[in-house]
Amino acid sequence: MSNLYKIGTETRNKIKKFRTSTARTDSIKALSIKIEPKPSYEIIVDEDEQEELDEIEDLSELAEILPDNSPRFVLTAYPTTTKDGFKQTPLVLVYWKPMTVVSQEWKMLYAGALEMIREECGTFKLIEVSSGLEDDSDVEELREQLENC
């Protein structure tokens, strides 16, 4: 069976490096993953957004960095402290799909690639964000979901 999507070696290596480098991080880290348009449909790390994501200090900054007209996958390392006082940094895949995405093609492409990306990133924790994080309550809801992973 032929696959519509392709993940190159460079992208695989970047995901692997992100996973290992964020295992004990004390700050939020995020890796933006997107699908290239026709004809390749290659899954790549979005370098333009990545520079800004490397500087992120709070979840509310995601809305300013991520596009409001295109979906993304954001592999996120979110450090938390458990009730027992242990520090942990779970990897969570955030499926960014703002309500303003009008292209049915993009919605279908990202929905179809979701399981492939989850498997490649090695996480089964998934949070779908469709609010655009415009309100403080949206950011707080995302924060709670990340802390409960």
Swiss-Prot record:
Coiled coil: none annotated. Residues 3-147 form the ADF-H domain. One of its GO terms (cellular component) is cortical actin cytoskeleton. SUPFAM superfamilies: Actin depolymerizing proteins. This is Protein AIM7. GO terms for biological process: actin filament debranching; negative regulation of Arp2/3 complex-mediated actin nucleation. The keyword Nucleus applies. Belongs to the actin-binding proteins ADF family. GMF subfamily. SMART domains: ADF. The keyword Nucleus applies. The modification Phosphoserine is found at residue 137. Keywords: Acetylation, Cytoplasm, Nucleus, Phosphoprotein. The gene is AIM7. Disruption phenotype: Sensitive to nickel. It comes from the Eukaryota. GO terms for molecular function: actin binding; Arp2/3 complex binding. It is found in: Cytoplasm; Nucleus. Signal peptide: none annotated. Present with 3040 molecules/cell in log phase SD medium. Its main location: cytoplasm.
